[in-house]
Amino acid sequence: SGLFCAVKVITNIADAFQTVEVNLNKWKPVIPNKKFDVNIRWPEDIQAEQRIFDEKLPAVQEFLKHNKFNEVTHDATNKELGIIAVGKSYVDTLTTLQKHNIVPEKHGISILKIGMSWPLQGSLIEKFCSDHEDILIIEEKGSLVEDQIYKLLYGYSYAPRIYGKNLLSRCL
């Protein structure tokens, strides 16, 4: 898409080391067939914002739709709780459930793994949330994903109850 990008590295990853062999033959990303200028200009011209919103962000959404950065990994049939877990929090969530012998699907828990946290894949979030009455968002310190979900679902008749950074204050 030609957008600026960043990678968030948490302490557990930054303070660890491991040699990893990457096999690029295993992951073949689907690249949308969009024709526009992906080059970054410096200094950027006045039409930059228009290109971002009209061309580049839609290209990112198209890329997300065809590649599994964000996906439902556990899909309960009796959907009581939807958990949206972001990045390393996804692994921590699965570890915690396993430690307490909780099989998500047997307990009515569906889990959506978020690997790319901005911009969120709106259609996937809306579909996942429409199937649940309660959503628990688990992410690191900031509320980047939680805030996006509030904005995505604002005004929808099916909007579930959302618990995230505000969970503790609701319990007290």
Place the predicted regions along the sequence by residue.
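Flexible, low-complexity linker and terminal segments
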Residues: 1-172
